Amino acid sequence: MATKTYNAGVKEYRSTYWEPHYTPKDTDILACFKITPQPGVDREEVAAAVAAESSTGTWTTVWTDLLTDLDYYKGRAYRIEDVPGDDTCFYAFVAYPIDLFEEGSVVNVLTSLVGNVFGFKALRALRSEDVRFPIAYVKTCGGPPHGIQVERDIMNKYGRPLLGCTIKPKLGLSGKNYGRAVYECLRGGLDFTKDDENVNSQPFMRWPQRFDFEQEAIEKAHGETGERKVHYLNVTAPTPGEMYKRAEYAKELGAPIIMHDYLTGGLCANTGLANWCRDNGMLLHIHRAMHAELDRNPHHGIHFRVLTKVLRLSGRDHLHSGTVVGKLEGDRASTLGWIDIMRDTFIKEDRSRGIFFDQDFGSMPGVMPVASGGIHVWHMPALVNIFGDDSVLQFGGGTVGHPWGNAPGATANRVELEACVKARNEGIAVEKEGKAVLTEAANDSPELKIAMETWKEIKFEFDTVDKLDIAHK
């Protein structure tokens, strides 16, 4: 007759994974989840279930728990808070011991923290609101290949935001016509142009031809203007091997920066590419295509501030951040919060901006936020005020949509940028006095004057879907 050697069966998660008196360690990875439980499910039980299913637990007791120090390795739900203005959900705070995760692998961290637990039947919805990475874990990650200061030195441009443009139409141009569009934008006054996120290697424009014509445009514009000019060459590809092949070719051409779609391309590929860029002296621009599928639902998914932290650890020198004023989602307070996460060494907990934990990045370089998406000349004063100097302001349609063409569109943006920076430096409240600043600058710039007339009625005044919970109070 078999002898029962351990307490088999199913027991409540809270008996093992709910520890309200636990004090998180400096080395713990901390997570804040917004949990919407199924009707009738107890808060403490479902918080403990999230801690269990995202760490060591499963649905039943297993005898192999006796072969390890479960109390050391388990995640612990240690605090529950109400969500302001929403009684259908609550915040649960979970602490994970650092040894649960492979060093330097945000892939491994996300596999646990936002893995199978998001499909748990006891939950109607689950959202990762914030994560605190301890400095002990941060130090195991490569981070940005170079960072803000190195990019400034490469570009030899200081004291203002960098100015860019996404080439439009994003799809359908031949390589030669694409290169022509790049040249016109750069000679008109832009610092950067870029491939759009879905420009890879399609039948109408294969990547080698695009790279060749882009580099020709860069060199011609540089020769004419005497300024350093750059284009982000998108190396996103079907396989890692093909991605590195394109990156190597960009390097051979002399391009200083390449681009990657980090979510569709994958975090494993992104970390590898960041390491390659560090070793080869290349800057890395990151597009966030697919992010809104993950982060826009206020009750389920992964908040963009979490994706921002993860990508800073994985590695990039630029990241698209939204604009506040353009066509894409993102309120001012939240956007300022994740801009700080990109650039600052230490970010203090600040619920008014959606930041739930202190975050220390130590000596890890900062990252340039990229404002892009539906912006034009009338937005410049607000963008200069919101983003400051260490940023890239990227006007796609707001450059190539100019009635006189790409070069005049670029000139209009360069004139207004310099006018706004000058006004700010003179102590003028540039966002408040923006109309006067632009009107004065337009007196000496017909390109700016016609741009202001063209887009004077264009606004994107839609309510934000993913509001800060503090705003509901």
Curated annotation (Swiss-Prot):
Its cofactor is Mg(2+). The modification N6-carboxylysine is found at K194. Mg(2+) binds at K194, D196, E197. GO terms for biological process: reductive pentose-phosphate cycle. The record marks K327 as: Transition state stabilizer. Transmembrane segments: none annotated. The keyword Lyase applies. It comes from the Bacteria. Substrate binds at N116, T166, K170, R288, H320, S372. It catalyses: 2 (2R)-3-phosphoglycerate + 2 H(+) = D-ribulose 1,5-bisphosphate + CO2 + H2O; D-ribulose 1,5-bisphosphate + O2 = 2-phosphoglycolate + (2R)-3-phosphoglycerate + 2 H(+). The active site is at K168, H287. Keywords: Calvin cycle, Carbon dioxide fixation, Lyase, Magnesium, Metal-binding, Monooxygenase, Oxidoreductase. The keyword Phosphoprotein does not apply. GO terms for molecular function: magnesium ion binding; monooxygenase activity; ribulose-bisphosphate carboxylase activity. Binds 1 Mg(2+) ion per subunit. InterPro entries: RuBisCO (IPR033966), RuBisCo_large_chain_AS (IPR020878), RuBisCO_lsu_C (IPR000685), RuBisCO_lsu_C_sf (IPR036376), RuBisCO_lsu_fd_N (IPR017443), RuBisCO_lsu_N_sf (IPR036422), RuBisCO_lsuI (IPR020888). Its EC number is 4.1.1.39. Belongs to the RuBisCO large chain family. Type I subfamily. Heterohexadecamer of 8 large chains and 8 small chains. The basic functional RuBisCO is composed of a large chain homodimer in a 'head-to-tail' conformation. In form I RuBisCO this homodimer is arranged in a barrel-like tetramer with the small subunits forming a tetrameric 'cap' on each end of the 'barrel'. RuBisCO catalyzes two reactions: the carboxylation of D-ribulose 1,5-bisphosphate, the primary event in carbon dioxide fixation, as well as the oxidative fragmentation of the pentose substrate. Both reactions occur simultaneously and in competition at the same active site. This is Ribulose bisphosphate carboxylase large chain. It comes from Hydrogenophaga pseudoflava. The gene is cbbL.
